[in-house]
C-alpha cells in the first residue's frame, strides 16, 4: 500500500525551512503533495500561481513531490486527494498550541486524518516566511534562507 502525505501551507514564499521539511517527508512517504493555500485573508505578497511556480521549481529535484494549490478546508482537500496524513513543521513551543488545535479540528472533520509533526533542522528552526519578507523589505540579506529562484523573485517583487 502506498502512502500519500500532504504538506500544507501558504508558502509566501517557500523557504529553505519548508524545503527541509518537504525533503524529509519525501523520504518517508511514497508521495507528498505540497499543498499551497490560497489564503486571501493573509494578503500574500505572491499570488497563488506565483507561489505554485516558485515551489514547483524549488522542489523539482524531489520526484515524488507534487505542488498543488487549494482553497477549501484541509480535511476536504485531503479527502479529495485520498490522503490521510498531514505533515506539519514545528519550529518552537509557540507553534505547538496552534498546530494541536488544527490537528484536533482536522480529526473532527476527517477522523482518519493524522498529523505528523517534523522539526526543521537547527539551521532553519527560527525562520518563517514572514520574518524573511520583513528582513528583505529592509534590505537585509535573506539569500541564505531561500532557494535561489525564490530569492530572486522576492528581490524582483520588492523593487
UniProtKB/Swiss-Prot annotation:
Keyword Coiled coil: no
Feature type site, description Transition state stabilizer: 18
Primary location recorded for the protein, binned into one broad class: cytoplasm
Residues the record lists as binding substrate: 10, 42, 74, 88
Nucleotidyltransferase is among the record's keywords: yes
Top-level class of the enzyme under EC nomenclature: transferase
Catalytic activity: (R)-4'-phosphopantetheine + ATP + H(+) = 3'-dephospho-CoA + diphosphate
GO biological process, one term: coenzyme A biosynthetic process
Cofactor needs: Mg(2+)
Cellular localization per UniProt: Cytoplasm
Coiled-coil annotated residue ranges, if any: none
E.C. number(s) listed in UniProt: 2.7.7.3
Binding site for ATP: 10-11, 18, 89-91, 99, 124-130
GO MF annotation terms: ATP binding; pantetheine-phosphate adenylyltransferase activity
Gene Ontology, cellular component aspect: cytoplasm
Pathway of action: Cofactor biosynthesis; coenzyme A biosynthesis; CoA from (R)-pantothenate: step 4/5
Keywords: ATP-binding, Coenzyme A biosynthesis, Cytoplasm, Magnesium, Nucleotide-binding, Nucleotidyltransferase, Transferase
Quaternary data: Homohexamer.
Family: Belongs to the bacterial CoaD family.
Function: Reversibly transfers an adenylyl group from ATP to 4'-phosphopantetheine, yielding dephospho-CoA (dPCoA) and pyrophosphate.
Name this protein carries in UniProt: Phosphopantetheine adenylyltransferase
Organism encoding this protein: Klebsiella pneumoniae (strain 342)
Lineage summary: Bacteria, Pseudomonadati, Pseudomonadota, Gammaproteobacteria, Enterobacterales
Amino acid at each position: 500500500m502506498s502512502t500519500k502525505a500532504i504538506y500544507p501551507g501558504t508558502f509566501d514564499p517557500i523557504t529553505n525551512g519548508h524545503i527541509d521539511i518537504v525533503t524529509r517527508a519525501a523520504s518517508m512517504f511514497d508521495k507528498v503533495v505540497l499543498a499551497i493555500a490560497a489564503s486571501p485573508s493573509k494578503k500574500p505578497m505572491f499570488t497563488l500561481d506565483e507561489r505554485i511556480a516558485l515551489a514547483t521549481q524549488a522542489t523539482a529535484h524531489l520526484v515524488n513531490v507534487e505542488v498543488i494549490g487549494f482553497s477549501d478546508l484541509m480535511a476536504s482537500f485531503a479527502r479529495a486527494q485520498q490522503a490521510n496524513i498531514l505533515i506539519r513543521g514545528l519550529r518552537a513551543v509557540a507553534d505547538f498550541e496552534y498546530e494541536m488545535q488544527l490537528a484536533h479540528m482536522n480529526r473532527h472533520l476527517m477522523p482518519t486524518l493524522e498529523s505528523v509533526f517534523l522539526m526543521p533542522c537547527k539551521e532553519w528552526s527560527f525562520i518563517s516566511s514572514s520574518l524573511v519578507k520583513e528582513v528583505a523589505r529592509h534590505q537585509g540579506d535573506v539569500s541564505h534562507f531561500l532557494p535561489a529562484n525564490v530569492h530572486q523573485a522576492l528581490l524582483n517583487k520588492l523593487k
